[in-house]
Amino acid sequence: CHTYYHVYVTFLKELKLRAEADPAMKAGAATLVLSKMSNNFENLKSRVESTGLFEEVLEFDEKREDFFPELEKYREDTGSFLGNLKNRIRFTQEYARLEASYVPVDLRTYKDIYVYCDSDPIGYYLNQNHIRYHAVEDGLNCLKNFDAARYDNRGHFKIKAFLSMYLNLIFVQNGYGKYCMDMEVNDISAIRYPCPRYIELPRKPLEDRLTAEDKQLLLQAFVR
C-alpha cells in the first residue's frame, strides 16, 4: 500500500475474506506492507496492528529511482529508439537489483500478492524476480481520465507492451508486466483502452456488506 486509500480498500477486501471464511475468526492471515515512499503513515502501523485483522504489518522503505545515482545514465536520450530501448532494458534490470535490499519480506513465500500502483519500484522488483502478483488500480476509476501506462509509453506503445508482457525486457505498469496475472479495476467501461488483464471488482459492494463490527474496526484503524 502507498496511500491511506489503498489501506482502506485492503481492509474492505480482507474483511470480506474473513466473513466468507469464518465470521468468528478474529486474526487474519495476511501481511500488510506500507510503503513509505510517497506517504507518511505516521502511527497507522500500530493502529492497524491493534485491529488484529492482519497477521503482521510491515513498513517498506521503498526507494525512488533518483535515490540511486547510478541509474541516471540509463535515462539519457540517445537520439534513437533502439539506443533508448537498450538503456531502458538495463535500467529495468538494475533498478530491480538495487531495490531488492530494501524489500522487507521474502515475497516468494506468499501465495497471493496484491500491489497498488505497480508503476512504483515494487513493480520492477516483482517482474525482474519472476514473482507473480495481482495489481489493483491506484485510485477509484483512476484510469478513466489518465492512463499512465499509455502516457508514459507513448510512441510505439504496442511494441513496448509486448516487450514487457511477453519478454520481460522492460516494465510497463498497470497490467502489462509479464508477471502481473490480472489487475482489479472498479469499472472497466470507464476505461477507454482496457488492458486484456483487467478484471472488474466494484468497490461499492465491499462497502455495502460492512457489518457494525467491521465499521468499528475501520474507525479503530483510521479515526480513533
Label each PLM-derived region with a short phrase.
Residues 137, 144-224:
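A nucleotide-sugar donor-handling region in carbohydrate enzymes
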